């Protein structure tokens, strides 16, 4: 089989398309013929050895896939060869075939494309866990979403509206603002590009405060980090919940007096660990996502597709934060 492999730490330019023996499923596993693989920010980090998961090299990046079952390992029940599935793999998805634990796979509805399926799990499962379990989001509350036109950002916007929140989208361009509005955001605010000095931080904080209104944001969803985090935190409501989802702009440092003054919570969101520790709760969330998908309340936005040999370009686009929605690699 063909696979796009990382042989050494580095950027997308270090990836090489190689031939490997076909993998075989072990006990409790399925072999999936990959038809589509979504690109996410962890793919940027994992090939540079900057992610918490560090697979032995050589390895293929690609953390979520859609495809068809080609073979079934011992003890697997409920699946047959040819079934259409989606799964989060962590890595290994940028290959023609990948072995997946059967318990980690979900059935892809026949009416949905492989491209859509590959773009669903990681971003939407992260966002529903963040908003409901960590953020305790309630109908009528105000949700501020940073980076609202990215994969997890658009998912948070759609889910916020599905749960009847007032959603304020914060983005870096008018094009991204329109994408957030199209996803259902009640309002969108365009913030300048960082980094910021102290005066710039004050301007940014005021921008967020004006966007959410005098009562503040009940929940703030932050997949951006960097200088945006503190500025956003200053717009939080009394007893609000600030969700740390990611930090492509850098790991933020917060003055903790702000949390005291607002009596607010700063909550980390590590969906992968949650799914491993509480698989039943995660499976329930995924079933909810499928229901919302069928109802048309959520819909993964795939802005571009790439062939396997050009997957490095997709990873670079994610790294440079040029993407609206999701990028998907299609594998024929």
PLM ranges: what are they?
Residues 21-38, 50-92:
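Glycine-rich beta-strand-centered segment in the early N-terminal region that forms part
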Residues 162-227, 281-284:
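Adenosine-nucleotide cofactor-binding segment
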Residues 171, 180, 227-297, 330-332:
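Glycine-rich phosphate-binding loop and adjacent beta-alpha segment
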Residues 33, 45, 78, 84-147, ...:
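NAD(P)H dinucleotide-binding glycine-rich loop of Rossmann-like/cofactor-binding domains
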Residues 84, 142, 166, 240-241, ...:
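Short glycine-centered segments of the SAM/dcSAM-binding site in methyltransferase folds
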Residues 118-194:
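Mid-domain Rossmann-like dinucleotide-binding core that forms the NAD(H)/NADP(H) cofactor-binding site
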Residues 148, 224, 247:
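NAD(P)H cofactor-binding loop motif with strongest signal on the N-terminal glycine-rich segment
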Residues 290, 295-304, 312-332:
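C-terminal capping/lid region of NAD(P)-dependent oxidoreductase domains
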């Amino acid at each position: 089989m063909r696979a796009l492999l990382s042989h050494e730490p580095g950027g997308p330019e270090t990836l090489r398309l190689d031939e490997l023996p076909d993998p075989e499923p072990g006990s409790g596993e399925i072999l999936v013929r990959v038809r589509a693989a979504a690109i996410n920010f962890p793919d940027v980090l994992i090939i540079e050895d900057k992610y918490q998961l560090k697979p032995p090299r050589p390895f293929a990046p690609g953390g979520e896939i859609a495809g068809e079952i080609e073979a079934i390992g011992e003890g697997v029940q409920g699946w047959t060869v040819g079934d259409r599935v989606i799964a989060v793999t962590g890595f290994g998805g940028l290959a023609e075939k990948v072995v997946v634990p059967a318990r980690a796979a979900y059935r892809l509805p026949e009416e949905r494309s492989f491209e859509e399926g590959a773009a669903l799990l990681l971003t939407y499962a992260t966002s529903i866990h963040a908003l409901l379990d960590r953020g305790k989001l309630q109908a009528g509350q105000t949700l501020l979403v940073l980076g609202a036109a990215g994969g997890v950002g658009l998912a948070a916007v759609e889910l916020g509206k599905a749960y009847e929140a007032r959603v304020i989208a914060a983005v870096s361009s008018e094009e991204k603002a329109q994408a957030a509005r199209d996803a259902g955001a009640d309002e969108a605010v365009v913030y300048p590009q960082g980094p910021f000095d102290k005066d710039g931080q004050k301007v940014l904080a005021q921008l967020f405060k004006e966007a959410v209104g005098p009562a503040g944001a009940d929940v703030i969803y932050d997949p951006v980090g960097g200088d945006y985090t503190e500025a956003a935190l200053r717009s939080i409501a009394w007893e609000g919940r600030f969700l740390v989802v990611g930090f492509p702009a850098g790991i933020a440092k917060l003055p903790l007096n702000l949390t005291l003054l607002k009596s607010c919570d700063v909550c980390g969101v590590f969906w992968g660990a949650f799914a491993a520790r509480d698989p039943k709760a995660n499976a329930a969330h995924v079933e909810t996502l499928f229901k919302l998908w069928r109802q048309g309340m959520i819909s993964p936005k795939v802005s571009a597709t790439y062939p396997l040999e050009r997957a490095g370009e997709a990873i670079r686009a994610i790294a440079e934060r040029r993407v609206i929605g999701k990028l998907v690699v299609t594998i024929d």
